[in-house]
Amino acid sequence: MLPNALSIIRIILTVPIVIALLKEQYLLTLMLFLLAGISDALDGWIAKQFSLQSRLGSILDPVADKVLLTCSFITLYWIGVLPLWLLMIIFVRDVIIIAGALGYFLGEESSESDLLEPSLISKVNTVLQIALVLYLLLIKLYIGIDGFQDMVFIIVATSTALSGADYGLLWVKKFILQETKK
């Protein structure tokens, strides 16, 4: 299915994005990252518009986002433009999401029909994280917008923490619901 293919393309694009970033080819990195971002928007839209939603797609899309963003953030930290504290907040949120998802979907009560549906705060957070990468790439291209870094970091940290808390509550509720059904 096309939406799943777009998610796989996004995962594959991560490799040249990281390589271009490490080689300080910021314009190429920016163009590749924009292409990956477009594929992210398209896969969800196509899946919903043409009723192509699937359990695989509900897992593959956020995995593609995590691979792209995590590799980008680690590389941006490595080259010295992303602070460690923000990388750690993002990492903790991702651990909460992955641990909760594994716990829920490996549970006895989950079914093949379960679809992972991201919350609004999670969608906003993903957009803000993508915007952060784009912003940092523009700074590396000397666009002259670096005076807003601290504010951008705080906005992304806040949305990431709120999204992590939202997922934490979601997984606790789902776990309690599973336990009460036993």
Question: Which residues does each PLM region occupy?
Answer:
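N-terminal membrane topogenic signal
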Residues: 1-9
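Hydrophobic residues in alpha-helical membrane-spanning segments
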Residues: 4, 15-17, 63
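Residue-level signature of the cytosolic catalytic core of signaling kinases
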Residues: 1, 24, 52, 56, ...
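A feature for the membrane-embedded catalytic helix bundles of lipid/isoprenoid biosynthetic enzymes
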Residues: 31, 63-182
